[in-house]
Amino acid sequence: MALPNKPLGELKAVRDPEVEEREVDILIVGGGMACCGTAFEVKKWMDEGQSVLLCDKAAMERSGAVAQGLSAINTYIGDNAPEDYVRMVRNDLMGIVREDLIFDLGCHVDDSVHLFEEWGLPVWKKTEDGKNLDGKKGQTMGTLKGGAQPVRTGKWQIMINGESYKRIVAEAAKLAIGEENVLERVFIVELLLDANKENQIAGAVGFSVRENKVFIIKCKSMMVACGGAVNIYQPRSVGE
């Protein structure tokens, strides 16, 4: 459950904040699309008795780049070939790519889009006479998985009503691992290494952005996806 946006009263920094220690098998750092997907998938592979915790410095329903809402999904292969998608990405990124990873994405990305639609994401559809139906009306045409044709804005993009895109995916993540295993408003600032094993992750330290509290979380495995990757390259428009 998300804490209120505004703390009740002024939070004063003190020398000795409350310290809470936790220990889990799997720690997921971040609350954007990547970590929501991780939370949904990891539950399928966890053994009975294993524990997981997701830490987000904001509230999952409105955190990350997708929280602003989107009008399109940039990659839906559909009737196209994954090999063509690899060629497009390779050209777009000036050859600095892992073609095997791109090909795998092209082979499986449609399954993720089908899941989003099953969870409630409205996708625009084409009618048999070529008319465009927006998300709500498009539902009358059936699902993409069932063979309905999406409305495209290019070769790879499909149109959606994505105002609540992130809320839909965050809800699926919370249902998968349980809300009690989601820690919101906690900013992870330091990763911890095992004292006895070189380069072995052992945990993380963070602080609450709403309470005067520090968290020390021990773990055996960690997934870190805190965004910002879109800033690795400048836009193509600058001619880099």
Model-derived features with residue positions:
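Conserved N-terminal/central alpha/beta ligand/cofactor-binding core
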Residues: A2-L8, R15-E18, E23, Q50-S51, ...
